[in-house]
Amino acid sequence: MPNASLVIANWKMNGNRELTKTMSAALREKLNQLQQVKLVICPPFTLIGELANQCYYDDIAIGAQNVSEHTGGAFTGEISTAQLQEFGVSYVLVGHSERRQLFAETDKMVNEKALATVNAGMTAVICVGENKAQRDEGNTWEVVAQQAQAALADLPKEQAGKIVLAYEPVWAIGTGETASPEQAQDVHAKLRALLVEQFGAIGEKMPLLYGGSVKADNAAELFAQKDIDGGLIGGASLKESDFVAICQAAQG
């Protein structure tokens, strides 16, 4: 049986106004069959308002792909927590591997963004994961643990309910490769222990998502793992039929 309760779509720099309409309509048709699964869509910033309007009466949460650690000021091109909240955003991706690799986001920045997000009352979806060289060298857990511990630093226990961890093996993002259910579960089990160590019993209930080429045909097997509570979906979240099928796999 699936263990999933949260599925997040990350559209990255894709999509348009038409996709907000067709995707929300496709999900709306199936919402009564997906009552055990929380659905979140993270579109590009320019589509947040449009998607929020499309989903106004639906149980579909709106997420952002990034946020500034600053509250405002002379930070050209950045966006604050307050500006996101004005458009109904309740989830924020923090530390995605593409932000770390392409935009030089450091562990310190990821931590500051996570703190800014939860302090504003939104849920921070903190992304961690190793690249292929690190996995091949046997350093998967060392890398993942270091990223997770750095991102969670100074987060008080009372904020634990506003934290989601997403394990995204970098070598499996957009490559067609996927960690086996057993490989993913191994990392998730260790992340679960890390959360319990830092936050106590509530760590048992904090969502752990898998992100790394999740597709309609492998979602059910991944979601059946004990410590995989859902998915962070990239490419497959851009096609209505594929994303609906993944959400249905989470529901079981």
Swiss-Prot record:
It catalyses: D-glyceraldehyde 3-phosphate = dihydroxyacetone phosphate. It is found in: Cytoplasm. GO terms for molecular function: triose-phosphate isomerase activity. Its EC number is 5.3.1.1. It is an enzyme of class 5 (isomerase). The keyword Cytoplasm applies. Keywords: Cytoplasm, Gluconeogenesis, Glycolysis, Isomerase. GO terms for cellular component: cytosol. PANTHER family: TRIOSEPHOSPHATE ISOMERASE. Involved in the gluconeogenesis. Catalyzes stereospecifically the conversion of dihydroxyacetone phosphate (DHAP) to D-glyceraldehyde-3-phosphate (G3P). This is Triosephosphate isomerase. It comes from Idiomarina loihiensis (strain ATCC BAA-735 / DSM 15497 / L2-TR).
